[in-house]
Each structure stands twice: as structure tokens, then as C-alpha cells.
């Protein structure tokens, strides 16, 4: 029986993880559920799963949850704050940690789980975007096992040889016959919208993703293709890929979730319904397979599969992310922070959709001019840079909002 802590239990990844566990009650059990502030949802989950621990990052929310669970789940211990997230991520009885807290907030507890040598089911791409080499080094040092949950990275993982699967972050793709990793993306809801009309896009339009069901932040990132940019950075670290080995392709149908091209001309593609339960099930059970509760792909209903080159005029955030990836750790940490601030401002109707890329570009330029590339060798230094970039992004947002 594999025992789990789920960080980000009230989000869409948390829901899909619990769906897979429900399909396989004899294989997995929930020790701890953790979230930010959604007390109502957490209350329902605790009532259903009766975990040993329930954690709310927001301490006020933790107090409200504690009162609510006194009768509904009296055996569940309720904890609050960032330290509590790290505590349940490192519990001795826990085998695996689903790292699904959105954004920079997920980095510290995910890193704590890595240092504790856990099996890390990595759904929080920002952890690698923000800490890159530091993260990979800690995985190697602690002997933690890293398994990618993101559908694209999970697809790539499945298409790679076992020698690479067991050596993420350190592998040599060329020695295993790999020529290219092809990262696919749908292009979001605006791939055919006139570029001039993007300025007027509303938050409601931006979060209506054509293929996937996701939270608001990642839905906006998919619309700008920043999500693909962050995935590009994550893929660079996970698969130790260089610029020539990593390519982004637009695939509107989201049937193929990514591909690996080999030196002999072969291309392996992983296909399936756009349902996160599939990659989650694989990370939970790897190297075995378990039921995920996902209907099989019906090829007679698939229709055509199309592929396009990304248009960087339409997706300036994707271009920024690829550029940041090769500028260094200071650039990717900065870009991630600026983007989180910009997306929140757009969702709050403070800036336009097209301002997201402008905020990101402005903050990235300001930080790169300050020569902050050195000295980012600790979690504290990265978090300090993250805070600085957010402050700069707030200033740019205020300017653009006027």
C-alpha cells in the first residue's frame, strides 16, 4: 500500500489524483491533504477521505477548517502555515508526495519532500522553473525519485528508454539515440484569433480552454502559451536537453501529448484522451500500470491530427520563456514571478490580456540589466529574487493599469 501526501488537494490535479486512488483503493491510501485556503472543498475531502492530517497554508483558513472538522472528521489533525506543508511533505510514513500547489508557493514544500527522499509526483512545473539545477542536485543528493505529472512531460517520459526514465535531470539523450523532444501544445483558445483583437480578450474568454479542464491561472498561461514556455524550461531540466534537442509544435487536437524523435528516423508519440488522470495514474503506479477511470481513445472519432509551427507574434510569452531558458536561472525565476503577478492582474481586470507579455518582458529586462546571474545557489537566494521580481512586476502593473 503506497501512502500519499497530496499538496494542492483542492485543485484540479488534486481531484484527478483522488479519482485515480478511488479506482485503486487496495493500492493507495491518503495520509495528508494540503491546500491554500479553500475550506469548503477541503472539508468535503476530509469528510470523504478521513486523512491523518489536513493542512491549510492560510492559517486563518486552518482555524475555520479545524472548527468544521471537529464533528465531521474528528481524527484528522488540522495544521496551518508553510511549515505545516513541509511537515506533511516529509512525514516518515509517507512514500509519495503529489506536488500540485500552483506557482512559486509550491517550491518550498516540494523541495522539502525532495530532501526527505520521497517519490515526487511533480505537477508543479514552477518548482523546476524557479530552481532548476538546485532542484536536480537535491534529487540526486537525497535519492528521491522524480516522476513528471504534466501531461507533456509524462508523455515524453513514456516515450524515452528506461535508462533515461531512471536518470532524470542527468541523462544523456544523444547516447540513448534521441535526436529531438517534440513538446506539443494546443495553442489555446486564440490560435485563430486576429492578433489585433487579442488586446480586447476578457478573463472569461481566456480561461475557456478548448480541450483541457484546468484552473484559472494555468488556463490563462495556456492562452498566452506561457504554459508551454514554462513546460519548455521544465523539459530542459527533466531531460537534460539542449536547445537543438527541444522543439515546440502546435497540435490543436491535443490527442498526441508529446513525441520523441530518434536518430534512426523513428518517432514515438504518446496519445490519449485529454484527462490528467492518465499521467497521474502512471506516476502513482510506475513502473506498473493501474486503472485511471479514463475512457480509451476511440480512433474512429479522432478525425484529423494537425501540426503547426508556433507564431511568436501571437505568443510573445512563449518566445520570452525560451529566451529566458538559455539566459540562466535568474531569468527563469524572474519570468515565472512576473508572470504570476501579471496573470493575477489580468484576472482582476487591472491590465489587458496583451499586457501580460509586456509586464513579463519589462521585468525580465530590468532584472537582466542588474547582473543578478551569480549567487543563486540556495533556495533562500532564489526566493529573494522571486520577491524582488514580484515587486517590480507590481510596479509595471500599476503603470499599465493607469
UniProtKB/Swiss-Prot annotation:
Chain residues that bind NADPH: 10-13, 38, 124, 126, 215
InterPro entries: DXP_reductoisomerase (IPR003821), DXP_reductoisomerase_C (IPR013644), DXP_reductoisomerase_N (IPR013512), DXPR_C (IPR026877), DXPR_C_sf (IPR036169), NAD(P)-bd_dom_sf (IPR036291)
Transmembrane segments: none
Enzyme class: oxidoreductase
Positions of Mn(2+) binding: 150, 152, 231
Chain positions recorded as 1-deoxy-D-xylulose 5-phosphate binding sites: 125, 151-152, 186, 209, 222, 227-228, 231
Catalysed conversion reaction: 2-C-methyl-D-erythritol 4-phosphate + NADP(+) = 1-deoxy-D-xylulose 5-phosphate + NADPH + H(+)
Cofactors, names only: Mg(2+); Mn(2+)
E.C. number(s) listed in UniProt: 1.1.1.267
GO biological process, one term: isopentenyl diphosphate biosynthetic process, methylerythritol 4-phosphate pathway involved in terpenoid biosynthetic process
Alphabetic keyword roster: Isoprene biosynthesis, Manganese, Metal-binding, NADP, Oxidoreductase
Annotated pathway: Isoprenoid biosynthesis; isopentenyl diphosphate biosynthesis via DXP pathway; isopentenyl diphosphate from 1-deoxy-D-xylulose 5-phosphate: step 1/6
One family name in Pfam for this protein: DXP_reductoisom
GO MF terms held by the record: 1-deoxy-D-xylulose-5-phosphate reductoisomerase activity; manganese ion binding; NADPH binding
Protein family per UniProt: Belongs to the DXR family.
Function: Catalyzes the NADPH-dependent rearrangement and reduction of 1-deoxy-D-xylulose-5-phosphate (DXP) to 2-C-methyl-D-erythritol 4-phosphate (MEP).
Database matches in NCBIfam families: Dxr, PRK05447.1-1, PRK12464.1
Protein name stated in the entry: 1-deoxy-D-xylulose 5-phosphate reductoisomerase
Amino acid at each position: 500500500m503506497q501512502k500519499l501526501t497530496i499538496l494542492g488537494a483542492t485543485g484540479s490535479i488534486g481531484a484527478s489524483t483522488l479519482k485515480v486512488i478511488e479506482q485503486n483503493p487496495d493500492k493507495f491510501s491518503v495520509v495528508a491533504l494540503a491546500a491554500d485556503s479553500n475550506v469548503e472543498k477541503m472539508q468535503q475531502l476530509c469528510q470523504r477521505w478521513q486523512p491523518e492530517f489536513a493542512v491549510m497554508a492560510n492559517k486563518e483558513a486552518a482555524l475555520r477548517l479545524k472548527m468544521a472538522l471537529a464533528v465531521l472528521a474528528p481524527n484528522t489533525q488540522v495544521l496551518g502555515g508553510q511549515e505545516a506543508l513541509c511537515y506533511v511533505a516529509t512525514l516518515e510514513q509517507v512514500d509519495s508526495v503529489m506536488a500540485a500547489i500552483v506557482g512559486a508557493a509550491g517550491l518550498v514544500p516540494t523541495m522539502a519532500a525532495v530532501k526527505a527522499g520521497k517519490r515526487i509526483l511533480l505537477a508543479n512545473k514552477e518548482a523546476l522553473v524557479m530552481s532548476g539545477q538546485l532542484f536536480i542536485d537535491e534529487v540526486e543528493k537525497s535519492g528521491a525519485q522524480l516522476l513528471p505529472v504534466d501531461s507533456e512531460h509524462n508523455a515524453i517520459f513514456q516515450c524515452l528508454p528506461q535508462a533515461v526514465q531512471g536518470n532524470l535531470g542527468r541523462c544523456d539523450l544523444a547516447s540513448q539515440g534521441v535526436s529531438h523532444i517534440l513538446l506539443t501544445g494546443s495553442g489555446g483558445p486564440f490560435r485563430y484569433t486576429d492578433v489585433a483583437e487579442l488586446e480586447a480578450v476578457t478573463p472569461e474568454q481566456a480561461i475557456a480552454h478548448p480541450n483541457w479542464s484546468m484552473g484559472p491561472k494555468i488556463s490563462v498561461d495556456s492562452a498566452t502559451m506561457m504554459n508551454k514556455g514554462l513546460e519548455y524550461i521544465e523539459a530542459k531540466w527533466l531531460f537534460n536537453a539542449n536547445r537543438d534537442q527541444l522543439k515546440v509544435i502546435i497540435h490543436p487536437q491535443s490527442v498526441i501529448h508529446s513525441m520523441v524523435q530518434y536518430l534512426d528516423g523513428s518517432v514515438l508519440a504518446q496519445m490519449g484522451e485529454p484527462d490528467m488522470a492518465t499521467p497521474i495514474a502512471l506516476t502513482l503506479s510506475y513502473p506498473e500500470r493501474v486503472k485511471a477511470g479514463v475512457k480509451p481513445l476511440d480512433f474512429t472519432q479522432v478525425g484529423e491530427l494537425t501540426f503547426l509551427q508556433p507564431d511568436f507574434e501571437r505568443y510573445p510569452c512563449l518566445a520570452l520563456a525560451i529566451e529566458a531558458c538559455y539566459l540562466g536561472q535568474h531569468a527563469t525565476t524572474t519570468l515565472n514571478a512576473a508572470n504570476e503577478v501579471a496573470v493575477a492582474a489580468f484576472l482582476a481586470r487591472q491590465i489587458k490580456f496583451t499586457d501580460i507579455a509586456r509586464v513579463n518582458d519589462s521585468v525580465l529586462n530590468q532584472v537582466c540589466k542588474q547582473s543578478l546571474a551569480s549567487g543563486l545557489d540556495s533556495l533562500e537566494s532564489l526566493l529573494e529574487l522571486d520577491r524582488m521580481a514580484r515587486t517590480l512586476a507590481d510596479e509595471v502593473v500599476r503603470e499599465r493599469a493607469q
